[in-house]
A protein has these predicted regions:
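Long, hydrophobic/aromatic-enriched structural stretches that serve as scaffold segments
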Residues: 19-20, 33-46, 58, 62
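Soluble or luminal CAZymes and related metallo-dependent hydrolases
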Residues: 37-40, 92, 158-165
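Helix-to-beta-strand junctions that scaffold the AdoMet/dcAdoMet cofactor pocket
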Residues: 173-175
């Protein structure tokens, strides 16, 4: 792992066109977050939900369930609807929802498996859209054919086929 990490850091230094290596350039390389998947801090999600008084939340790329955890921790929030293209996460979502529902029975949550841009995915009405789409070509969580990096192999195709359509689709559900 040390060699792989060193190679990724060298790649980041090269991408940033760093002329020298120091604390600041190393921090910049680490903060790119493009060499490892990162967690969206549930505490940050909670703070955002609270600040905006989010009641009906739609999460277009539910990820590891971090924003779901923030939803349950928020003093606001009545319903959460998430979608994710990684089939391997469904069991984890179900377990999270089951446990959180014991503590917060007044809140409802559902996470479905699928590609948000597909027409068969119907988004519920919401007052808050909150998501963290995968970095193009970097975050590769499974070989599932619904993964955006496999469906859209070029950045322009990914933007046109994935990112822009899910944004447009979700805006229509805002009430």
């Amino acid at each position: 792992h040390d060699v792989k990490f060193a190679k990724s850091m060298c790649g980041a230094l090269f991408s940033l066109k760093c002329k020298e290596v120091n604390t600041n350039t190393l921090f910049s390389c680490l903060s790119l977050r493009k060499y490892v998947a990162s967690q969206f801090k549930p505490s940050v999600a909670k703070a955002i939900y609270d600040y905006f008084h989010a009641d009906r939340v739609v999460d277009l790329c539910a990820g590891w369930g971090d924003r779901l955890a923030g939803f349950y921790a928020s003093k606001y929030g009545k319903s959460y609807f998430g979608i994710d293209a990684n089939k391997n996460l469904q069991e984890g979502y179900s377990a999270q929802i089951k446990e959180y529902s014991k503590l917060f029975p007044e809140k409802t949550a559902q996470v479905v498996y699928g590609a948000t841009e597909d027409e068969n995915i119907v988004l519920p009405e919401c007052d808050f859209i909150f998501t963290s789409p995968p970095y193009f070509g970097i975050e590769k969580y499974s070989k599932d054919d619904k993964q955006s990096y496999l469906r859209y192999r070029k950045i322009d195709k990914w933007l046109e086929g994935f990112l822009f359509p899910i944004i447009k689709k979700s805006i229509k559900t805002l009430k």
